[in-house]
């Protein structure tokens, strides 16, 4: 079976243009990958229109807003569907995406190649977002700098570390907020953190919803094994920052040794 490859290019507004060999009467299908054991529910169909040199193009506009998750890309011929392999991907516009201020809600799309070699689109949809800029580990402390999108920090902002699977165990830190109320830094140097995984949030003002710290605004769909940080040793524990499978920033706390 000859495998069809789809090229794709993104523009600054978040539009994705897919290009495939001429496909008369066919369409492009994006399928939100269901959680294990659940049926698929969300499909999005795009028309393919003739382009130059025997090619066909489909455009995924900035609207509609796609649900957060992983969208597999198929060629649809009647009711038959075939997963597409990746052709050339032009994602240059995403590389410095963190430099542009975003508005709420934040809708992010990153085309990528799956582990088994097919084309997919990773999407995030967040009411507001705290984009991690730097993570510095020095000695027994780690310092995180980040920037808010879709929210600002007037006064009384706090960073919260929340123990996953803990009984509501939370540590609160005071961030250093930059001019303009968007950029902030904070340092974790706590020898008394419980062993386990701590998720990181910022609350921009008292009573405001908590915003997850993550790194979403570039061309890396799966950051976990690409950005690997050392641990900070404090007292009898090692605190290591890492990116989750959703590109959220968390802390892993282990005993030393």
Task: Give the residues covered by each predicted segment.
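Basic, ligand-binding patches in group-transfer machinery
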Residues: 1-257
């Amino acid at each position: 079976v000859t495998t069809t490859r789809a090229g794709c290019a993104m523009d600054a507004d978040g539009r994705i243009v897919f290009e495939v060999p001429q496909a008369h009467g066919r369409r492009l299908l994006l399928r939100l990958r269901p959680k294990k054991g659940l049926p698929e529910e969300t499909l999005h169909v795009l028309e393919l229109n003739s382009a130059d040199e025997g090619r066909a193009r489909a455009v995924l506009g900035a609207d509609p807003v796609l649900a957060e998750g992983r969208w597999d890309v198929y060629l649809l011929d009647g009711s038959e569907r075939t997963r597409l392999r990746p052709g050339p991907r032009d994602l240059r516009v995403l590389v410095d995406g963190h430099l542009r201020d975003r508005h709420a809600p934040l809708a992010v799309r990153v085309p990528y190649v799956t582990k088994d070699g097919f084309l997919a689109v990773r999407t995030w949809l967040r009411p507001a977002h705290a984009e991690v800029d730097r993570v510095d580990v020095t000695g027994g402390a780690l310092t995180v700098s980040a920037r808010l999108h879709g929210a600002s920090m007037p006064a009384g902002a706090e960073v919260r570390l929340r123990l996953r699977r803990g009984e509501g165990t939370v540590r609160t830190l005071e961030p250093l907020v930059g001019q303009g109320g968007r950029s902030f830094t904070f340092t974790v140097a706590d020898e008394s953190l419980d062993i386990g995984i701590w998720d990181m949030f910022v609350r921009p003002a008292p009573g405001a919803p908590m915003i997850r710290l993550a790194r979403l605004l570039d061309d890396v769909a799966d950051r976990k094994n690409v950005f690997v940080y050392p641990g900070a040793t404090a007292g009898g524990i090692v605190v290591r920052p890492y990116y989750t499978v959703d590109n959220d920033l968390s802390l892993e706390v282990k005993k030393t040794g």
